[in-house]
Amino acid sequence: MLRQLRLTMDISGWIFLPWRRSMSNMKESPPPPPLASTFDDVIVDYEDPDYLPLPEYPLRPNEPLQTRKQRLLYQSRKRGMLENDLLLSTFAAKHLQSFSAEQTAQYDQLINGVSNDWDIYYWATDVKPTPKEYDTEIMGLLKEHVKNAERVSRLRQPDLNT
């Protein structure tokens, strides 16, 4: 038994010995150059090509107000990009239940009428100017919410009320 153990140790030492030698001969590589970072990076914005038509969002004229609010709450939480998920879900949790039917329709048009979620993000954070058709009372509330004057932590989406 001891003879087998000793043989195994000899073999493992022999197998890994060349590897140890090659590692000891390696020189340290110089650190990579620092990444260039500026605060005035330009946002490249391309026009949507004509050959990729985007489907129109279906209007729901006979949808009850409470059902519409529930749908908008879900859609505010499931945007597909974390930035808008956090901003819109916290905004909807704070304001959506107090919206009138007209305000709810404006919010529906804002989050479902825009084909690119990055546009909503850039408008809400005042990186790009908001187009007139989306510059509504709801967009003003969203911009105030994004400024976060209360300094509320928004690291995760709010819990759903059950």
From Swiss-Prot:
Residues 1-23 form a transit peptide. Pfam families: Sdh5 (PF03937). InterPro entries: SDH, SDH_sf, SDHAF2. GO terms for cellular component: mitochondrial matrix; mitochondrion. Its main location: mitochondrion. Gene3D superfamilies: Flavinator of succinate dehydrogenase. It is found in: Mitochondrion matrix. Keywords: Chaperone, Mitochondrion, Transit peptide. One of its GO terms (biological process) is copper ion homeostasis. Interacts with the flavoprotein subunit within the SDH catalytic dimer. Belongs to the SDHAF2 family. Plays an essential role in the assembly of succinate dehydrogenase (SDH), an enzyme complex (also referred to as respiratory complex II) that is a component of both the tricarboxylic acid (TCA) cycle and the mitochondrial electron transport chain, and which couples the oxidation of succinate to fumarate with the reduction of ubiquinone (coenzyme Q) to ubiquinol. Required for flavinylation (covalent attachment of FAD) of the flavoprotein subunit of the SDH catalytic dimer. This is Succinate dehydrogenase assembly factor 2-A, mitochondrial. It comes from Drosophila erecta.
